[in-house]
Amino acid sequence: MSPTRPGLEPLPRPGDDDVRARVAAIEVLSPREIDGRLTDLGYRGQPEARRAASVLAYRHLRRIRRLHLEGLPPEPGTRENCLFLGPTGSGKTFLVELLFREILAVPTVLADATQFSETGYVGDDVNTVLSRLYEVADRDAEWAACGVVCMDEFDKLATSRSDSRFAGQQTTKDVSGFGVQRSLLHLLSAPSADFPPDFGFTSRQQPGRMELACVTFIACGAFSGLKATAEGLERGEHLGFGREPLGSHKERIATHVTEEQLEQTTAFARYGFIPELIGRFNRLVSFAPLDAATLGDILQDNVLRAYEREFELEGLRLRVEPAVREHVVARALKRETGARGLRATLAPLLEKAAYEHFGRGDEAPATLRLTLEDGHVQARVG
């Protein structure tokens, strides 16, 4: 950290022992044990992505233990930056939350990449993600440097100066262009970086400096249209006149990008990304669309169980017949919205019952039944 300048307040400096104790308190689990914890916490499906992410979490813990418990510098080339690609509702950010907020319990920030802007323009400077990491780490820069930054909607940073078109949205929206990508390029490779402790709202504090050798950066995005772009390259399609527009392929929203397609840096470049930025991610993990069986498990083990607990507190037993579960899963598959579509279908129905019966402590215990009648879900209390 640079010396304090006149008129600027220095950052607080917590003791090294605080960080050491926090790191020592994290339970050391093998990648297989981490994967098992994911199941215990309700994560379903995505076996390949789970394996990759469990190893990512294990390596993250190993790095911070090496630094703070063994007193050894990070091994060269061990920094992990990971790119999660897959359709909406496939469990990308949920996996990050469970791994790093729940299992490892290290400082974790989920940032919306569409809010980033190039320095000097309206919007969040890229380095403000470090400000947020500093905040969730109780304003302890050393503890923050043990954390994880997850940038969601990363695919929306694709510049419009390409032939990329977001399938399903029919737009070539350019949120921030190459400027933000260049800023991220530096952040993902720099050994350390300055950050505004107050998010840049005032100039009373000197900039903080955070060591980044142990910070794991994860980018998440649907990358709708990337598969069609990669397949076009495989067919030898060219740029310019005579090329079939990408949108004409009518690619489904929920698609699975193969490992071979992930290796095509040219596909990312045509999509609208600087090849060097994609190269900063040493692991690209593809998430598959969730199938009916997995959605059924998520519906039963996560969505319905949460609703059952809520309604039970209000004196209502929630009962959902199998036909309703199949209907809800089928609608989520049709919408291609993955696990998000499950709650979207149930929420309006259950909100009506909640409006009528929540907060009325004088009512006797009752049962709320969801049934399927003529293709429509009905909710009745009796």
Identify the residue ranges that each predicted region occupies.
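AAA+ P-loop NTPase nucleotide-binding core of proteostasis motors
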Residues: 2-45, 50-109, 114-135, 139-382
